[in-house]
Each structure stands twice: as structure tokens, then as C-alpha cells.
Amino acid sequence: MDSSQQLQESQQLQQQYTRVGIDVIGPMKDLIISVMNSLDTTFKIINETYRIVYFDTDETKLTSSNLDSDDEEFESDDDADEEADLQIQASCNLYTFDGKNRQSVDEIKRIVQHLNETQSQQNDNQAVPVIPTFFVVVNIGVGPSFVSEIKSAAGTTQFIEWIVNDQASKEVFKVSTNLLSHHKKQIELTHACTVGDVNYLDQIILSGVSTDQLKEAHKAGHAIVFDSLLTHNSNSLVVTGTMALLGAIVENGDRKGKRLSLSRSNLSRFPMSITQMCTHLVELDLSDNKITELPKDIQLLKSLRILILRGNLLEDIPLEICYLGDLKILELQENPLNNFPLSVVQSGTKNLLLFCKNILERKKSETWNKVKLMFVGQEGVGKTSLCQALKGSKKKKAELQVTGDTVSTEGVKIQNIKNKKVEFHAWDFGGQQVFYPTHQFFLTTHALYLVVFKLTDPNFAERVNYWVRQVKSNSSGAVPAIFLVGTHSDVCTPEQLQEAESILKANFVKYSRVKENTINFVCCATGKGIKELKKRLIHEAEKSHLIKKDIPGNYMVLEARLTNRGANPGRMAVSGSPIGGGSSAQLSSNAINSQKERYIDYDDYMNECKLSHLQPEEIKGATDFLHNLGIILHFDTPTLKNLVVLDPQWLADVMSSLITFSHNWIKRGILNHSELVAVWGGKYDQSLWPLLLKLLEKFEVSYELPNIAKSLIPSLLPEDAEGEISTIKDREWVTLPQAIESGRCQVFGCDYNFDFMPLGFFARLLLRILLISGVEVRTYWRNGVLLDILTPEQVKLQQSKQQQLQQQQQQQNNNESNDSSVNNNNNNNNNNNNNNIINSSSSSSLNLTQTSTSTSPSKLSLNNSQINNSNSTLNSQQLINPSVSPLSSTTPRHQALITFIKKKSFESKDKDSYKLNIEVRSFNTTIEKDHSASLFFQQILFTIDTLLASSYVGLEITRMIPCIHCVQKNPRADPYYFDFSSCISALQDGKPHLFCRNDPSIPVRIDYIAPDLCLKKVPTLADNEIEYEKQIGKGGFGLVHKGRLVKDKSVVAIKSLILGDSEGETEMIEKFQEFQREVFIMSNLNHPNIVKLYGLMHNPPRMVMEFVPCGDLYHRLLDKAHPIKWSVKLRLMLDIALGIEYMQNQNPPIVHRDLRSPNIFLQSLDENAPVCAKVADFGLSQQSVHSVSGLLGNFQWMAPETIGAEEESYTEKADTYSFAMILYTILTGEGPFDEYSYGKIKFINMIREEGLRPTIPEDCPPRLRNVIELCWSGDPKKRPHFSYIVKELSELRNGNTTSTTTNTSSTTNNLNSANVSIASTSSNADDGSQTNNNNNNNNNNNNNNNNNSGSSIALSPSRSFEQQTTTTTTTTTSPSSPSTSFINSSGSYNTESYSVASSSTTNLLNTLNNANQPVNFIGTASVHKKMEVLAGVEAGETVWTKSADSSLCFWSTKKGHLINELKCPHTVATTMMIKVGKYIWEATNSNGIYIWDMGTMTIVQQLTTPHKGDVCLHFVEYGDNNGVWSGGSEGTVCLWDMQTFEKKHSFSLESAITAMSYFGNNTLYIASGSHIVVFKTKTLLMNVNQNWKHSTGSITSILAMKDEVWSGGSDGRIYIWKVKNEFELQKVQSLEAHHEKITSLIHLEDNVLSGSTDKCISLFKISDPKKPFTTQEHHKQGVTSIVKVQSHIVWAITSDTTTPLVLWNIPQKWEKKTANGILPRLKFFR
């Protein structure tokens, strides 16, 4: 070790502790020094860590000049320690004596005499303490002992007899620490008293100081004071504080009441020594210091009567202060006290103590006098002026009087109106209609409402009507407290006022719980009526109990803390300044910091609750309380639950900023996310934008359109079809008489009539309509949408056009600059805590005038001038139907017009004041010939019903169906309308038609007027087609019978809907709709792991379904006497996962919402059966267009976000959580949470708030444990996609099956059987299905009859497990193929040209090993041409390789033969390939990384990187900052998200990055040049040590394992490093492994395999690496890389172009072999 290394290690040690020396003297010093320095001698004095070094001063001085550097490679740290010891001064003397030597008696006498003389001399100088001394007498060996004489001569000096090393060394260390501590504290006490540092004095006292030492220090302080009086210096002023504290402590024992004043003592914290050693104080003055926190231990000063704390920096007061029973005076002036209610502080000492006591005793005894006062009404009616008048603002009359032309640009303005009795929190809502959708989420029950209107407005009743109904609809069924306030009374006649009052009394007073003085007429200009209104508001606040008198005090503490953090008006120094708009950088910085406190995340909020003394079970109540009062805003939904808004005004400003933004392109209703900088730039931090978009979506201001980086803002759409929208509508939607009289049109539809509907409903519906597949939107506006319904042939054509467009866009993206994408990636990198990321990678969008939501047209525009430009030309090419009248063609065409009509006049008494109209037309065909229109009608009604049921509960809704007979007879007259319930009753009675009242003689077919009720897609079965057998089930819906189909005697289950006579109309409709919903969902599902629907029956309504013979999973698990085998359990898990994966891959995804063991049915318990488990019972299922909602039961199975979620929204990820519970149930046989016994309320709270989950058994396989824990994550976005789940379960199941084999034949048969092998490969195929799922809207299971096929088929990404399963055991299992092009015409693989040189039929998994040779040659792959393989990667059932000629080859993992070859679309040279989930990441020597989908064999993403030259990749699957790490020759390291492909982090090193490796513990080892860099992925900290390097050459490969890191170099050497701790490596070995560069290091169980360009591969035992097995046989050229295919199979890639791939079989254990010669491969859970 050279001197620089010694110095560096010494400095590192110095940073950890300070060395303190003990001078060891005497004949036995060598023994003492050797033994004591071998121990850990670290200890603490005060707050500093020391390490004792025992040394001989004379000897170190003598040897210091003779030290030489030692350059040996592996050297201990002793030399560095020794050099560091030279610089240490002795702080203690240790004299050693030989207890067997008589001379020791004389020697100790001489030393004692010398010590006494020294002590006497130093007593005169108290400032310099004497260095302590102690004796050690070594009494070891034979012979007489003189210990007793020596001890007698030692006198009072501490004495230790050394007999046994272990015991004596501990005693020596104990005496050493005591003496050194006493000595050091004496010095520091003297210093603290001398300089008057009370803070440090307190710290010393708290560390433990004897009373004698304190008295000595007190005496020294008196000496200083006395000296100052003699010399007239000011030292006495300096030591006043320290003297006072020491005096109080020293005199505390006399138990007399003392006073202590430490005023102006520069205290930075409360002296804790006071609470411990001054317990008899009666008065304590700590004023005018810098104390920031008062400790809870203040309660220990029981005698305290006066406590003066004014002029400090206190933010809070501990509740424990209430235990100071004698405290009479508490002075807290001039303290911030931001975290304690100011009103309580101002109420006096007695009330403050009582307040704190009530909180500790959990008493609800505080009064809350803050009341939310809501000002609502149209713009220009005087709301702001009324608020100012109530506030008592002294504005001029001209300012107070608001004219009708005044328009607010703020959505909500919040102010305070204070009064002695009550403090009103006034919310002034902007009256413009664009703000209306933003208001409803601010409206709460616990508030007073002022519905303000202008008395001079002739239509004031219509304005009042809307707001009264809006407030009522947001009151959760309660009656709100509404005051009707008319302004401008001064310009009205008494007659006008009387008429207005009569209108208000007759129509609106009934909606308010305020029965007296509800109506108020005021004049803000003169103040008339203002005082009376204010009195009435205060009276109502008291009467309605809005002034709360029984709330917990900790609510007030929490409110104080949050208000302090929030940016409330008047408290923010820069609240009015735009960010970046200040005059200085300092101002801008302050503004940014202020803005960040306008919201906090939920974890931070929980901490605030804890600091506010709230128990976990109290947090929800406190949150709801503050939310309802408008202090904070918090929405307990998956997207927003992590956000707590501290400043509602800020949130209102965010919404206003978007709605009132004046750019024309936003006014057209579409916001491009790339333009957000124009809206929010300089106002809101860019990292917050994705979360703001989600907030705006929650408040119905905008809707983020999936995957296209745009948002729809419905309130900014044109209200009516005007301009170009009107032109398109008039051209394509002919009048009803024209359509009917043409004789070529069939019409049907329905109306939804609402008594009231808040604004924003149609905007939410419009979003869902835009996402329905199989339609082509022609145009839409704020209250309507016109679309074409595509036939199946047109859907196929549409998908073809879409794929072409995507290819064009991908090509365009490759050619254009990606600046916008880079910018957005940077934005997201700053927002790692936000789960919602703006996806700006897609350039597709929606066209507002002519477009299809299923295709991806280019630009979006409403600008009339752009309709005829090139963009329109492109759009017209994408549209299936031309923009012409349907009457101009004879081809079939289906149309739908959906419009929302709101009430036009208050005087209208019609029930249909708000109407949603759906009209569907079929031209040149009938609904009997083409079901497209009927199926769409079912879909749209299902969508509407779901939206109404989930978000508009309590509204009065009637559904009416127009009579088509009336329409056909006279299209110009209003038709008769059938009631929806009458249609249901007719179907219930088996009647196929109704009779119109306008023409009772003509029957009207129900399937014509309400095709959604008849579900033409589902076959209808007659009673004589079914044979009933027995009842097998019963539920709330009705009965379930077992039966048979007459035609083929196949067994079925018949589920009947029984509607009782006692049930009301509403209940009957709800039950029927639930029945219809299940039929609708099941009619669109076709998968072997989902119960199949065969048909429908009527009178009563019945579903004929597939019969599943083995019952449900719940009852099977109850049979404890016959437990299910582990292999069968795995098969059940996989089957259920496949079924749910299929549901979630639908567009939109299906959310089951009731996944639990009773709804899982068992087809077979034979693990090799085609199907074992099926998902059933879709009565509660919904389609998820972003989210669904609704209150559910069975909370043990439900995701946290769905429990009690009547108004919350959630996604299909809720089913993922429930699936975790099913996995747990199958694994353990127990129900979820059976191990706990809580009440339901506590259960739900613990599941939602505390993350309670069932206990997974310890013997659960790690892979399954990981799947379960990921699936039941509390954060829905962290739950995995089912393609990952299927892959994990398939691999687990595949491993379990193969572990049972015991001989060659059985192994071969099992591995070749279709059921076993497909289980492992289907996951790869299914992984690929996710990418293209949105492009393939039809079911991806059209070939369900392949289960028993005798030929081997390729696994298509769009086909499921059971479809791909074959039962023939003689055929080879097909690999996970990227495309069906792998199959020849006969249905088998085209493999004639390719084979492994050793055997074309070899199964590599079963290759026999040579018992005497650890590395066994399998063969070389021969190909049809020469190829230079650049890189390779294992991809499940295939191995991918990339060649220099841009060829991409796919080889069978098990057979080793070439399956297929494709031409790569790019020509860049590949440097590395790795597998990441269902993707292959390909690094190149350019600046690009290509990401391939394993299923579709297409490039799904190209990443632009900062790398140059050779690029390496490493995949970190678990832990913090997981993802793909990349490094390049320029020295940059990047982390990429493995799902969104966005860059998350990056940093740079000095040298090229050549390799990376990760084992665990959040540690990534990076090879950079010749050095190893240790990088912590959790903290993003790295450590570089000059010792961690190769002495010659650079590092070319690196391998991290549990306790070791192996690094291979360009010189052929391998260095082995010991991992000492998380930031420290120690080189332990250097191996001369190869003669040239090491290209690969592969971990194989207990071995490490290396490859080199010297043509060799070497196998090292980790336990004994010095004796490797090396071979270069079969390698004609150097090994460039090694691909680990299985646990014991590796493929060596060489630079030889004729035999580039050499296959090797390597056992896990060299010595361990089975009886038949097959080495064990994997460990499995049984």
C-alpha cells in the first residue's frame, strides 16, 4: 500500500471518529498495546465519537523516520493506522508492571511520588486539568506474585490486575473511557463557562457530568466574576448565563423555589438540563432568544408559576404544558406560533392550558365559528359587491354598484368576513357559464348559500332555478341552507319587488331549509338590507349548527398548521406575483417556494395530522371536516388521493387560467399538451402540469384524451352546431321526413328525460362516446355528436387504414426532430412522485369536424378555413364514409345523432325540461339484416346507464321510447312514446310487441323500438329447446337450474330473472338492467377461461350458459379433507389470470368488480385438462372508459379505492387487487383476512389507510409472493398488467412440472407435452397482445376450436392459452412466435434448412452431461449463409440474434435450430440486446436504443440517447429506481422507465461505461474505464475509490453477486472483490483467467463462466476460483458474448461467420449427479 492510499484511508477513518491516545509505559506495554488495539475501542464523549489508540510515545517517535512504503497488492490497514497514530497526543497515561517481578513494587512507588508532585504543582492552575493516570499489573505465568504489594503501593490511583486477556481488556477499556470522558468534560466545562456558551454548557451537562465537576465549574465562574471586578473587564457579563444555569443546578438540592433567568443568552434551543436538574424552579425567563421548540418535558417543572417565552421563534406549543398545574403566567408574545391556533393563544393562559388538556383527554369541547358562505349566481348580478358590503368594505358607491356588463375572469374568489360571533369564509363564484362545471365540486352541505340575482333581470327566475337545483343536487340528499338575494332593489318599484317575492316563494323557497327570511332584497350601493341580511346569516349559522361547539381541539391545531403552510390571501409575500415575473431572481425563487406550499402530498398531510395529535382513526373525520368547510381540498379517489390542496383559491385560479385563456385554438375545445407552456408557463411549475391535468379532469374542466397528448375542453366547444359543424351536420344528417319518405331508412331511438341535470353531463358522455369502437365521429359540439356506425367490413377497413397511418407516422417520427418529446420527457423527470404522466410520444389526435376515434387522423381543427386544406384531404382519405348525404348512395349506412337539450324557459312545466335524445338510422338495409346499429344502440345505452348510475345518483330519470309506427306514418308529427318499464313488462310476459295508443290496432315490435332489450347478437332459445333437470343455485336475481340442450344433449346452466309482484317499477328496472348488463358483457366475451353464454330465453328472462361441473372455488377450498395439489393450484391460478387478462385486453377493458372465489368455477381438477378454471358472474361488471364507480360489498376482496366508493372512480386495476386475494386463497385455502377479527369499520380503515393485507406463508415461492404483493399494492398504478402476471405464473408452473421428472423418458415426454410447454410460452405470446390491443377492437379469440388440434401451431399474440394448447404429446412444442409467418402451409414450422450440428431432434433441456467434465459441448448451429452475429438474447422459447447484415434470427431454445429470419428495419450496428418483460431492448453504436415487442416482432419505440460508440444495457427488475440502465463510451449513464420508456435519471462519469451489474440491496456496479463505481439506486449517490480499479488495462465485464463482485479486464485478468458494506469493496483475489479481453461473466448457481476473445471459456467455482475448467474446443474464433438460455444451457457467440453459435451444457454442481446421469436443474416449491 503506497503512502497516498494510506493517507486516503486515514482521512476516511478520521471522518468517522476522532482518535484519542493513551500513552502506554512500562515493561508490559507491548502486550497491552497489541491486545487493546485489536479491539473496537470507539466510544462517545458528549456528542462526538472517539476511538482510543494505545501506543508508546517514545517508540513511535523512534520508528517514524524508518517507515517504508509497502507496495504489496493485498495489504492490511495496519500501516495506515500506525502512521495516523503518530499525530495523536496522549490524553491519559497507562503504566504497566510485571506482577511477577519484585522490582515493580519500587517502580510503582517512584511513579506515585512523581504523580503526587505533579498534581500539587497543577492544583495552582485550575484551567489546566491534570492528565489522568492508571496502573495495569500483568499477573500471568508461574512463579510468585507481588500484586498485593504493588496494589498497596499504588495508593488511590486506579489499579487493574491483568490475568486473562478477555476480561482484563474489557476492564482496561472501561477505566480508559471513564478517565478520558471525565478529563474531556472537565476541559469543555471550563471552556463553556469561560466563553459563556449556555447552549454548549447544556449539551455537556446532558451528556452526564458529576456534581463535583459542576461545582468546580461554578467555582471557576465565580473566579471569573471576581477577576472582572478587580480588572474592570466585561467578562462577568459574558458568563452571566452559564453562571445562572450552573447555580440553579447546584442549588436545586435545597428544594427551595428558585428563579432562573436566561434572557438574551443566545439560546438556539431549550436547555433540557433545566427539566432534568432544575425541577424546583418557580419562575423561568427564556425571553429574547432563538428557541424554536418547547419540549414535552416542560411538564416536569411541576412548581413553575411563571414561564416567559416572549421574543423567540416558537412555532408550536406542546400539549403537555397543561400538566403545569401551578402555571399562572405564560408569556408567548413575539413568537410565530404558526402551528398553534392563534385564537387559543390570545384567550389567556388558563384557556390555553384547558385547550391542551382537552386534546390529550380526547374531549370534543371546542367551538368552531368559521362558516362557509357561498355566493352563486350569473355574472354581473352583484355577487362581489354584496360580498364587499357584508365585509364592510369602505369602497366608493361607483365601485360597489356592479352593472350588468361586468364579467368576472376568476372562477372562485375566496375572502373572509369577520364578526364577533362568526367568521364567514366567503366563496365568490364566477358567474360565467364556462365556470359552472368547476363549481359543483366546491359546493358542500355544510355551508350557507346566497343565490344572488338581479331584480331588474326579466329572466331572473330561470337563473335562480338553475342554481337552486345545482346546490340541491350537490347536497347529498340533505336540504341546503339557501338565501335568495335580489340586488339593485333601489331601482325597483314596490310592485316589482312584490311580484318577485311571490315568484320566489311559489317556486324556490321549498328547496331551502331556511324557512324564515329566505328572500332578501338589497342594494349594495346604499347598503339597504345589508345589515338585516348579515344578522339573518349569523342567526342561521347558529340555528343550523354550522357553528360547531363540540369539535376536537386537534382539528383546530391541524387547521392552524395547514393554514400556515398554505398560500392563503394576505399571507403570501409574493402571492400576487407571477413566477419569474419579479424584479429579481430572489423574488422569483420566493414565488416558486410559495407556490409549492399550495398543495402537499398525502404522506406529508398524514405527518401533519400526526403532529396535530390526531389518531389514525380520527384523520378521515378531520379531513372531511376541513374539506367541507373549504379549508383544504382532498378527494379520496385513485388519481387524486395523494394530493391535498392547502389553498382552494389556487386551485380555482388553475381552472380559470385554462378556461379563460384567450387563444383561438383552445376556444375551439382542444388543448394540445405541447402548448401548455403558453397557458401555464411562468405560472405553475412544469413538473406539476400532469397532475393539474388530472385535477381539471376531476373537476370536469377538461378530459385527457388517451395516448394522444391532447385534452378536450367541452365548455369551450361551440354550444350549438354552427359554422362548419352545422354545414357537415346539415349535409350528412337529413331531416326526418326526408329520411322516412325516401323509403330506404329504418329509425329507432329513445329519450332520457331529466327533471334537472347539472352542466357537464354531456361533456362526460361525449368523452365516452368518442372512445366507443366501431364508430366514426363526423362532428361534435358542446351538446351533440353525429357519428357513423360501421359495419364489420368497414371496421376491418378502418383498422387497415389505421395501421397504414401508424406506419406513416412512425416513419415521419423517425425522420423528424424529437425536440418536443425530449422536452416532455424532461418535464416528467421532475415529477417522479406523480403517477399521471402526459404521453406526448404519439402524434395522433382527434379531428373535431370529421374524424374517427378509432383511427388516428393528423391535425385537429375547427377553423373553417382549414376544412378544405390538405389536412382535410388527409382526413377524407381516412374516413370510411364520404361526407355526403346518405340518400346519395345505395350502399348500407348507419348513423346516430345524440343531442342534449336543456330547459329553455323557466315557465315550461314539461317534465322533459332536460332531455338526452338518441336517434339511430339505418339506410339501405334493415336491423334484421345488419345488426351493427342495434349493437351500437346497446353499447351507447349501456354507456349512458353506467354514467348515470355511477355519477348522478338521485336524479329523477325517465326513459321514453318513440313509436316507430308513428314515425313511419307521419314523420312530421310528434310520435307516441312508450314507457321503458312497459317494454320490460312485455318481455317479462313473453310478449314480442306493444300497441301504440295513437293506433291501437297496429302491433309494434319491441325488437324494432328497443333493440337493446332484445340483444340480437345473442341467440334466442325456445322453451322446447331446453330440458330442465334440477335447481343448483339461488340468488337475489332468481334461480339457477341445470339443464340440457335438446339438439345435442350438452349440459347447460339456466339463470332465471324472477321479478316479484311486490317489487316497484324502479326496482324492476334496476334488476332487469343488471340482467341486461350481464348479458351484454358476456355476449362480447369469448374465451375458454370465461363462462360462455349460449343464448337467451324469455318469459321469464333467462340466460343459458355453459355448465361448469366441478362447482365454485369457494366451496372446493372448504373441503379440507381433500386438499388441492400444488401443481393443480398453479394451473388454477394461471387459468384465472388468463381469463382476467382477456377481459382487461378488451377495448374498453372490462372491470368485473366482483372477483372472489365464489365467482370462480372449476371445469376440472386435472392439471393437464384443456381448461381447469373459468371466471363467471358479470352482473356487476362495467366497461372502463378510464374509470368506473359505484358502491360494492364484500370488502375483504375489494381494492382499497373501491371500498365505500359510491362516488369514487376506479379502473380495471381493482380486479388486479381482487385477483391477489384469489391467489392468496388458493395458496392457503383460507379466506382473505380470516386471521384477523376486527369490526367492519376498523377493517375498512386498516385496509384503506394502513395497508393491512393477509399474511403470506413463509414457504410461498418468492416469484409467487412477488406477484401477490405487486397485485395488492395500495397504489393502483403500481399493480402489474396481466401479461406480466401470466408470464410469472407460467414460469412458476413450468418449473414445478419439470421438477417431478426422474428419468430421461419421462422428462422428455413432460417437456414435449403441449399442456406443459404452452404454459410457459403463452405468457410471451400474451405479452405481445397488449401493444396491439387497441388496434384490434374485435375479440382476439376467434378460433376457440383449436384446443384439441393434433398439429403444432404458432403462438399468436392475439390468442390465449387454451387456444394455443394442443393435446398431442408426440409433436414438438411450438416456441413463442412473433408472427404467424413462422408457419408453413402444412401448419408446422419451416425448419428443414436449419438444425443444430449435433442433432436435429436434441432437446437441449435434457442433454446428458459427461459426469467427469463440467462443461459439455452440445453442438454448433449451422445456418444457410455466413453471418457475423453481433449480439444475442434469450427470449423465452426463442433466442434472438442480430447480425452485421441487419438480419434478425430466431432460434428454438429447446432445439437450437433456426426458426425464422427477418430483415431489421434499421441498419445500425447492435452492441447489446436484453430482455425486459415482454420487450427486447436493442442498444446500437449510434445514439439510438430500439425496443422490440416480443409478440409482434415490431419496433414499438426508438429512444434517442446521449450515448456514443458501444452502448451497454442492464435491466434492474425490482427495488428502487428499477428499469433499464444504459451506459456509453462518452461516460453517460441513463435510467429508462421500462413501461413508459421515458428517461428518469442520468449522470456522467469521466471514462467510458463498458459494463454494469446489479444483484440487490439497491446497488449498481458500473465499470468505467479501469475503475468500479458503486452507485446506490435508492439515494442516487455514488462512490468512487482509487483502489477499486484494475492495475493494467480497462474493465470489460462485471458481475455482481451476493457477497462478491467479479470484474474482467482487457488484459484477461479477473479481479474478485469482497463486498464489505454498501459503499466499500476490498480486492481479495486476482486470477490470470485468459490471455485476451474478457467479454462475458455469467453467474451459474455456484459457478461463474467467463468468455474471452482468446477463444476460451472458463468455468470457476465461486468457493475455489483458483482451479477453473477451461476449454477452447469448438471455438474457431474469439468469444464475443455468452447468452444464458436456461439455468444450465449457454450459447457462446463467436466472431466466426460459419459457426457463430456454440451451445454448451453446464451442470449446477460439478460433483452432484443423479442416478441416471441427469443433473438437477431447478428448485421447485412443492
From Swiss-Prot:
Pfam families registered for this protein in UniProt? COR-A, COR-B, PK_Tyr_Ser-Thr, Roc
Residue stretches of each LRR repeat: 256-277, 280-301, 303-324, 326-347
Q: Which GO terms describe its cellular component?
A: cytoplasm; cytosol; mitochondrion
- Organism of origin is Dictyostelium discoideum (Social amoeba)
Region Disordered, annotated ranges: 800-890, 1319-1385
Q: What is this protein called?
A: Probable serine/threonine-protein kinase roco4
Q: Where is the Roc domain?
A: 364-544
Per UniProt, the enzyme's principal EC class comes to: transferase
The UniProt record lists the COR domain at: 591-787
- Residues where GTP binds: 377-384, 428-432, 487-490
One biological process term from GO is: mitochondrial electron transport, NADH to ubiquinone
SMART domains annotated for this entry?
LRR_TYP, TyrKc, WD40
Record field: compositional bias (Low complexity):
800-881, 1332-1348, 1365-1381
